[in-house]
């Protein structure tokens, strides 16, 4: 099991609708890929933890790095883990308004 945490900055402001769409898309795709994690969004920044098969997680992170909605993608840490920290979350989410969506 592998976990990667990154920080990125939005290139244009996300509307609440765009954030909901992004989250729905991430949840569908992550579930299909066997990836779990969480996403925080605040003041134009994303902090995301992804966990799953190392090759799959790295491939998804490379795709996110190429996504025109993200800039300044910085990997904060990458490590092998014994077990998932977000096992029940296809993608937990917390926005700048202070609402959690698990």
Language model regions located:
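Charge-rich, low-complexity N-terminal segments
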Residues: 1-99
């Amino acid at each position: 099991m592998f976990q990667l945490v990154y920080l990125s900055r939005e290139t244009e402001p996300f509307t609440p609708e765009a954030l909901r769409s992004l989250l729905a898309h991430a949840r569908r795709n992550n579930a299909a890929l066997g990836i779990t994690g969480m996403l925080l969004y605040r003041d134009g920044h994303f902090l995301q933890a992804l966990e799953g098969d190392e090759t799959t997680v790295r491939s998804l992170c490379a795709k996110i790095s190429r996504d025109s909605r993200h800039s300044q993608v910085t990997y904060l840490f990458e490590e092998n883990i014994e077990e998932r920290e977000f096992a029940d979350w296809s993608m937990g989410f917390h926005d700048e308004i202070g609402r959690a969506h698990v």
